[in-house]
């Protein structure tokens, strides 16, 4: 007789754009995971109001309010979509309470996670960090290049619609660049990484666009191209709006040192141009920067949930 598996209940701290979009995704498409609570600090926020209409438990008293609620004992996974400073406070309390934390801020208390690159080796982590929207969009490309050739240097430029950048994003610009650059190295495999974010004020708003530059110590363009296309297909498994804007560009170099590399010998400058269109669950389609964060976080939560369900079976 087949056993019915009970989904893992999740709570989301942060009732802004990211938290609300994540809630809608879980309600519509979540696998092995279900909404338990949406937590905010403003009782009149659109996110909390929408959650109440959808029958989701809410509190406007932050993490303390969630911890006092009767539903807290049933929560297995907690998403934090607040701010880096707030998550630093939340992380220790969640750890003490035995809750798995998925951090959507740049706090980086736990290991960086990009689902298609390093999720499987971090399934036992109690707190994981989703890097940044720019990191989720570009680190898979850096990793795709790095798995076929050494990458002494990688640089990314993330351009997002100004209208999609809420107060949390704007308050965390410095943390965004620092966290993304570090994750390009730690997760992407580049020896040195650099990140730039651009808030595009264009009206009507443009969808997220990302540029990735890698210095690769190889001349095998076909191997690099195949690896990049394979990685893009894998990311599209959870972010359907993720795509190449144009074909991968290569510039052969006689000597890597001419462009800042430490090794002599032939190399390639690899340029990859991406765009990310949002699914439109709660946010407009131009907010691909927010959609890729919530989609990646949900992919991590679903994998964690399968692990927890198997352990409880």
Curated annotation (Swiss-Prot):
Binding-site list for NAD(+): 15-18, 164-172, 289
Pfam family, one: Semialdhyde_dh
Active-site residue numbers: 133
Molecular-function GO terms, alphabetical: acetaldehyde dehydrogenase (acetylating) activity; NAD binding
Top-level taxon of the source organism: Bacteria
Enzyme Commission number: 1.2.1.10
InterPro entries: Acetaldehyde_dehydrogenase, Acetylaldehyde_DH_C, NAD(P)-bd_dom_sf, Semialdehyde_DH_NAD-bd
Keyword line: Aromatic hydrocarbons catabolism, NAD, Oxidoreductase
A Gene Ontology biological process term: catabolic process
Catalytic activity reported: acetaldehyde + NAD(+) + CoA = acetyl-CoA + NADH + H(+)
Keyword NAD applies: yes
Family: Belongs to the acetaldehyde dehydrogenase family.
Official protein name in the record: Acetaldehyde dehydrogenase
Organism in which the protein naturally occurs: Rhizobium rhizogenes (strain K84 / ATCC BAA-868) (Agrobacterium radiobacter)
